[in-house]
Amino acid sequence: MIQHPRIGIRPTIDGRRQGVRESLEVQTMNMAKSVADLISSTLKYPDGEPVECVISPSTIGRVPEAAASHELFKKSNVCATITVTPCWCYGSETMDMSPDIPHAIWGFNGTERPGAVYLAAVLASHAQKGIPAFGIYGRDVQEANDTDIPEDVKEKLLRYARAALATGLMRDTAYLSMGSVSMGIGGSIVNPDFFQEYLGMRNESVDMTEFTRRMDRGIYDPEEFERAMVWVKEHIKEGVDRNREDLILSKEEKEKQWEFVIKMFMIGRDLMVGNPRLAELGFEEEAVGHHALVAGFQGQRQWTDHFPNGDFMETFLNTQFDWNGIRKPFVFATENDSLNGVSMLFNYLLTNTPQIFADVRTYWSPEAVERVTGYTLEGRAAAGFLHLINSGSCTLDGTGQATRDGKPVMKPFWELDESEVQAMLENTDFPPANREYFRGGGFSTRFLTKGDMPVTMVRLNLLKGVGPVLQIAEGYTLELPEDVHHTLDNRTDPGWPTTWFAPRLTGKGAFKSVYDVMNNWGANHGAITYGHIGADLITLASMLRIPVNMHNVPEEDIFRPKNWSLFGTEDLESADYRACQLLGPLHK
C-alpha cells in the first residue's frame, strides 16, 4: 500500500545543557505539536483523509539529532519539512539539508529568547548552500508562554503545507498519454524532461487502439457496463441534435454510440488507475493500470474522424460522481494537452476540487456586447469578459449547482450530497456531437456555469531557453441575462459547456484590461478552479522552480522562499525568473 506523503516537523533548540536547553524543551516541542495539530485538523488529502505529520523523535540541538530526524523522515515518506523554534539554535548544525524537498522555518517572535535571530541565521545558511527555505515570522511579539499560533503565521504555514503536499503527491506518479499530438497543439507535444525534472513524474503512453482492443476482447467489467447503461438511460438527458439532416444518426445508431462512450469511460479510468475486477476476469496485466495521476486523450482527428469522441469519457472522469456513486475526480485533459493537464493538476492538488478545462475562446468588449445584444454590461462584467468553452466536455461540477451557505461552489467530493448530484444532471444535457467536426459522432456536454463564483484560471507554458512558466488570473464567473447569454452563446457552438469569466483587473501590466488578459494568455486552453488560489499557486511554483510570468495576486499575499529576496526586492517578477533559473528544477 502506498503511503500518503507527510509533513515532517522539526523542533530545533539551543544545544547548551545545564539549564538553557532544559528550560526550552517543553515550549519547543509544544510548538511542533501545535503546528502538526493545525495541519492535520485543517488540511486533507485528495481522498479526504486528514494530512499526516511526523514530529522528530526529539528536539534538535546538534548534528546527531538532525541526522536522527532525517533518518526518521526518510522512512516516513516525508515530502517537506517545517522547522520550529522559540530560541537561538546552531544554524547549519540543526538545518535539514535535503536538497530535493521544500523547507520552511517558523521562528517565534518573542523577546525572552532570540527565535528571530535563529530564523535569520539559518535562512542565511540555506541561501548560502543553495537549499531554498521559506521564512515564517509572526508580525506581532508574543508572550513566551503563549501557545497560540498567530493568524498570519497560520496562513503561511497552511499555504506552505498545501503547496508542499502537492509536490509530494505528484512525485513518482505518471502522466498517461492516450494517443499523441492533437491537431498540432503544442501542449500535447509531451515533454518528458519537464515531467521528470520539475514534477518528479514519469510519462507513459498508449495508442488509442487500446480502447478498441479492450472493447473487442471484452477487457472491461460487463456487470458494471450493464449497470452503467441503466444509470445513463435514467439520469442522462440527450440534448437537441443540431446536425444537418444528412448527418443525423438513427435512434439505433445513437444507442450503439451510448454503449461505446460508456465503455470508453470505463477503459479510460482502468488505464489510469487499474481495476482489480479485471484480474478476476483473467486480465491480470490490464488490472494494474498505469499509476497515472493525470492523463490526456488525443481524440482529434484520427480517433474522432472514425469513432465517437471522448467528450462523455472526459466529462465523467473529471466529474466527482458516476453510476458507482460520489467519488474523487480524476484529472483528465482534452486533446492530450499535457500542459493544461498539469495546470489542472496543480489546481486540484491545492484544492481537492474538480477542474474546468476550457478553450480561452473569445474576449467580449462592452462595446461588442452592446452592438450585438443591445445590452450594457454592468457590475463585474462592466469591463468585458472572456468566453471559456471547451469543445464538448467539462466536469459537471462546473455547473456550479453545488452550494455552500446558499452560494454556488465547486467543492471536494466528501462535501457533495445526492441532491447536488441531481441538480448537476438536471442542468446538463448531452447533445449529439457536431458531426462536421466529429465525424464519428459521440455526445457533447452542454451547460452554463452559474455566476458569482470566485475562480482562478491557470496555464503552464513551455518557453524554449527558459522552460516552464506559469500564468494566473483570479476573477469571477458571470451570470448574464438569459437573452444576452443565448445571443452570444449561439455565435459559437451552443452544444458545448460555457463559462463567462471576468478576471480581476489591477490597472497595470497584463491586467490593465480584460483584453490584455486575453492578449497575454500563453495558449488556447486554461484550467479553471474554484476559489482564489493564486497565492498558493505562486508558492507551489517557487517550490518547483517555475517562474510566474503573469498574475493578479496582491503583493502582500506572495509567499516564496526567503532567498528569492536576495535576487531583488523591487521587481519581484524578474527576481522570480533569476531565482528559478539559478536553482534549476526541483528534481534535476
From Swiss-Prot:
Cofactor: Mn(2+)
Disulphide-bridged cysteine pairs: none
Keyword vocabulary terms for this entry: Carbohydrate metabolism, Cytoplasm, Fucose metabolism, Isomerase, Manganese, Metal-binding
Major localization class: cytoplasm
Chain positions recorded as Mn(2+) binding sites: 335, 359, 525
InterPro entries with a match to the protein in the record: Fuc/Ara_isomerase_C, Fuc_iso_dom3_sf, Fuc_isomerase_C, Fucose_iso_dom1_sf, Fucose_iso_N1, Fucose_isomerase, Fucose_isomerase_dom2_sf, Fucose_isomerase_N/cen_sf
One Pfam match: Fucose_iso_N2
Catalytic activity entry: L-fucose = L-fuculose
Catalytic site positions: 335, 359
Compartments reported by the entry: Cytoplasm
Biological processes, Gene Ontology terms: D-arabinose catabolic process; L-fucose catabolic process
GO cellular component, as recorded: cytoplasm
Role, per record: Converts the aldose L-fucose into the corresponding ketose L-fuculose.
Family classification: Belongs to the L-fucose isomerase family.
Protein name: L-fucose isomerase
